[in-house]
Amino acid sequence: GTYVVRQTKAATGVKLAPDFTVLVGETDGEDKPLIVHNEPVTAYLRVVKVDADDGEVIPWGGAKFEIYDPDGNKVTQKVTYPKAETISVFETNDEGYFITPLVLPYGEHYRLVEIEAPKGYKLMDAPLIFDVTPETIKVDTENNIEYVEVIAGDKAVQPTVDSMATGVNDSKELLPLKETTITDKVDCTDVIPGKTYTVKGHLRLYSTGEPLLDKNGERITASKTFKADKDFSGHVEMTFTLDASNLAGEKIVVFQELYRGENLVASHTDIEDADQTVSVVAPEIKTFAKNGAEGTKDSKIVYSDSKASIVDAVSYNGLIPGLEYTLLCNLMDVEAGEIFKDADDKEVTATVTFTPEAAEGAVDVTCELNASKAAGKKLVAFETLSYDGEEIASHKDIEDEDQTVEIKNRPRYSHEEPKDNPTTGDTGIGPWAVLFAAAVFVTSGFLMFSYRRRKKDTIQ
């Protein structure tokens, strides 16, 4: 008859022989030997790199390993494809695993040693022990290979965050505007490629250390969610929008926290960190109004001419250089308390636009006016400094003498009676009297000449 022969136990290090059949017929009673061939136990090694916290595969290469056999010898494998080389270090691919190019022989207590961790992770604390035995071998039926799989988990490196907060034009300053922005450039280091993070930030007042609140009493916050791809630069930006109109002279500090999922993994909350700090400037202006005409003895007197000018010399400090500002000058009637209207019934105002190179400086604003009907009036220059249409400083003191000029008629010279008892060097004769005497002398001479001429003509 026909029999199936099945091996139920094999020697150490070899596989069970596959089943085979034998035909037993009528014999002469002699035994016939059967030859059984046992293949040695071998398998490829497949190592998968995972995150030790969540068990997810780390989906990029860079993890490097060495393999040591049960006798403590480093495993090397010689290959000819794609090039001839001897491999002693095995590296994970971009899918987070590697398979040895050649099989490993039967053995217990192989050691897998990580010599370089993937980006964002720490090296394994200890080698991983694995066996190449029939009990540990898996079969990949699709590729018809046998392998031993080892899952190698790494702990993530603790990430860090640092930042540089900036205001206008990448400076460290803000203008006290109703709406302005702070840009926070955050550097995230040791984040895990492939993982998703969120940077959250809020603003604090340096003077109190307390959170800066908006008009609704809520924290002023910003956030940015990003995925740390393989080529992630580590840089993200957040923008905070705030009302700084009442914060002139204050310092604002940005605090950041880095989350991976719901877990806080890093923070930067140093109230003394200058890199995280932006200052709100406190612009100030002072003025000195004067007659714009040249050669005037008293600069605070403006004559009642139809074409008069008043120059307001404005000094400023606390500006952010490189920005364009506008100065508006309104001439105010001190008595009326309103903008002065000249003889042409025009309100007298003037503007000048300038871009300072330094935080402090000066600029002139010239007001042209018809002052022919303004004699006796006092005018005060009111100044408003604005940026992008929003007032940031002003000087409007109706009683400020430096801002004040007086309109007067030009002086007229007239004949004066001689003074009694003139002193030495004083003839008592005014300049007009001298001119009058000269005119009389010339006229008398002319009349005498004409009389003599007529008399001579008559005799002839």
Question: Which stretches of residues belong to each language-model region?
Answer:
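Solvent-exposed loop/turn and edge beta-strand elements of beta-rich ligand-binding domains
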Residues: G1-Q460
